[in-house]
Amino acid sequence: MARPAYVAFLADVVASRARTPRARAMLQQRLRELARELNTRFRAHLAARAAITLGDELQALFTSPAPVWQAAHELRLRLPDVEWVVACGSGSLTTPLHRGASAPELDGPCYHAARAALDAAKADDRVFAFGGFDACVDGFARYYSALYGGWSAGQRLLANAQRARPDAKLKELARLVGVAPTSISHRRRRMVWHLVVLGDTMFQEVLTR
């Protein structure tokens, strides 16, 4: 019988070791708090709970790709001063999945695919990558990374807020981003946001099908 497929979720902080010891310690505390919040919010989708490993890397194991998009953008929204590389791998496990397990305790093809995708993303200066999925999923991730790389810091912040809170009204987005509502509208026009939404919708459809 075929082994069930899982999705290993790896989120690595860019250039974390360049921070001062004090700043890095504060970052690690924030990451631990974020992992706890993800465990609460995505409990129904977790095969193994999110935890911090390798100092500044967050790992989680999902039962399907369904929460990946939301989880990735929750990270970016909650820690806007942090640059993330997020990589996901689809596949089975080779270690036993026991009750209460944390993601870093486990191993298997899904983790190997995620690690290879993460390494490739870092080498190519990408921020989103996938392994073990249909090739078009990683193709969309490349489009995503290229678009993200061309935006200003303010545009990235707005994109992360809108992707993490797709139903938020203009005033709520303005609060999350820290600008006036009129600035939100201006940034959307500059980003041609309606086309970004179209691309994002297609990306999410191929990711979860």
Q: What is each model feature region?
A:
Residues 1-209:
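Regulatory and interdomain segments flanking nucleotide-handling catalytic cores
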